[in-house]
């Protein structure tokens, strides 16, 4: 289990490295070029030895695909990770995808074969497993058809309007980091408008530290649904 600078979780555990999404701003690809987690970033690799990290007894909020996209995982990889999650309900688990339709199909298949997924991901009631969709543009927001626990709008690349019926319980918002050519510097009004939309739907907002200077006194970090009480 790795400590992380990601400010909305306690730690990361990556059982898969690599992602075929080919995002220009992908920090995972940059890290892979330096540390060589997998041979070809566009071809995800399975690291089953990392499953043992879930068995840590100290409760944590764990991001399980910071170096991949869970929607691109093979079915058997997802099932093995679900096994480890169900066996270790002391933690809270968070996953992000740009491919919610593919992930939904895999989860439906898993749920049809086992009842214990409801223990961590019930239709109603407290969850121990949280799924979010990563969006950065209006086109991506418009394409969402799935109900999820949160949107991660990082990096925010342009103004975004979320249909009121699609607004999730939580928005995580962040600016692009790094030094990519063409890096987008967000405008404060883009973030202000997302906050207004969230407030109208009684949704929480968590701004990443990358927005602190831009937002000034309007910087905001509401309590996260997966926060571990200490």
Feature annotation, model-predicted:
Residues 61-63, 92-94, 128-132, 148-152, ...:
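Structural preference for beta-strand elements that scaffold enzyme active sites
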Residues 85-86, 111, 144-147, 193-202:
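Surface-exposed amphipathic alpha-helices with a cationic face
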Residues 67-69, 98-100, 134-138, 154-158, ...:
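Active-site beta-loop-alpha junctions enriched in small/polar residues
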Residues 1-8, 157, 162-230:
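Auxiliary Fe-S-binding modules of radical SAM enzymes
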Residues 1-129, 138-144, 160-165:
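Conserved Radical SAM active-site core
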């Amino acid at each position: 289990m790795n400590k992380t600078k990601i400010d909305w979780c306690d730690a990361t555990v990556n059982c898969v490295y690599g992602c075929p999404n080919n995002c220009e701003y992908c920090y995972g690809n940059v890290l892979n070029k330096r540390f060589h987690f997998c041979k070809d970033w566009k071809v995800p690799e399975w690291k089953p030895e990392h499953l043992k990290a879930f068995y840590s007894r100290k409760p944590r909020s764990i991001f399980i695909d910071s170096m991949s996209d869970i929607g691109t995982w093979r079915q058997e990889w997802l099932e093995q990770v679900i096994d480890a999650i169900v066996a270790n309900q002391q933690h809270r688990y968070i996953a992000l995808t740009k491919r919610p339709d593919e992930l939904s199909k895999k989860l439906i298949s898993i749920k049809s074969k086992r009842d214990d997924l409801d223990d961590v991901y019930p239709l109603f009631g407290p969850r121990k497993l949280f799924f979010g969709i990563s969006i950065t543009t209006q086109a991506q927001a418009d394409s969402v058809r799935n109900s999820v626990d949160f949107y991660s709008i990082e990096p925010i690349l342009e103004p975004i309007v979320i249909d009121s019926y699609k607004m999730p319980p939580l928005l995580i918002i962040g600016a692009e980091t790094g030094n990519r050519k063409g890096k987008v510097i967000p405008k404060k009004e883009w973030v202000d408008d997302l906050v207004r939309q969230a407030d109208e739907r009684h949704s929480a907002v968590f701004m990443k530290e990358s927005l602190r200077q831009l937002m000034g006194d309007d910087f905001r970090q509401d309590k996260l649904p997966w926060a571990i009480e200490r």
